Amino acid sequence: NSSRNSGVIHAGLYYSNSPNKEKLCIRGKHLLYDYCREKNIPFQQPGKLVVAQAGEEPLLNSIFERAVANGVPARILSGNEIKSACPDLSCVAALESPSTGIVDTQSLMQSLVIDFEAAGGLLHCRARVLGIDTSADLVQVALDDGTRVTADIVINSAGLNALSLVPSGVEHGYENFFLKGSYFSYASGVPFKTLVYPLPSQGGLGIHLTLDLAGRARFGPDASAVSTLDFAVRPEDGPKFGAAVKQYWPECNVNKLSPDCAGIRPKLKRAGSIVDDFVFLQSHESGGRKVISLLGMDSPGLTSCLAIAEHVFEMT
């Protein structure tokens, strides 16, 4: 859900085993910065530090080498540089990512809607899609109010529900694997002007520090597998968040952490293994009709959004 998003514009550091994410994140980052400048959408480019604790230097170096190979700006900071730039930061090494940014997601989405409607599109909110039928002359989308929308081409980008709307004739073998991520806000200022990330962990990028455009700090998200769509943040998780943050910011006051929001990542499994990449499924029907389904659109989906649109357009 785009409203449950940290608003980070990712540089494209992490996705060595996710070719679609890697390509579309790097391309999307440039498109998104250009779009924000063109449309006067609020954004900043504070950069990011990815920090390593003792024994984690090899993983940090592998991320750096991949970034360099892909033309993503990055450099390893020396111990003295870290102490000079962020004296409150605790780590043995850090990677600086200057092209990481933050964006006002609400303004971005509003601008995209304006563009869509200016091009002749009609936005129909609060309409539950019951199914997609490809058996007729046109693809038919059935809504819960009895309406049927027909088109030659349908783009299924329904997030957590996208897999359930893939036409029945498409064999794919994917199943949903939902990962919930919660955020905690911090009640006062933090001594950092850049985003701070630990090294990636299973299921996500670790409990990291993000800043909004007003400088307010949030920590998260964590990652826990869920079977139901529960968006409540558990206050009792505060100590867990505090312990994670204290690894790189020892002076964090756990008492200043409070539940903020939660989101659920629409990840996928196939043959029992997690598929950590964007997936594009296409249903080819007679007469040029088709349904294109966008699956597994979690992070870096926001960063990649305009590049994803380019890719889908090429598929049509």
Where does each model-flagged region fall?
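Dinucleotide-binding Rossmann-like beta1-alpha1 core, especially the glycine-rich loop
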Residues: 7-81, 91, 206-207
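Short beta-strand to alpha-helix junction loop
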Residues: 16-27, 51-59, 96-114, 232-237, ...
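Glycine-rich phosphate/pyrophosphate-binding beta-alpha loops
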Residues: 100-102, 201-204, 292-305
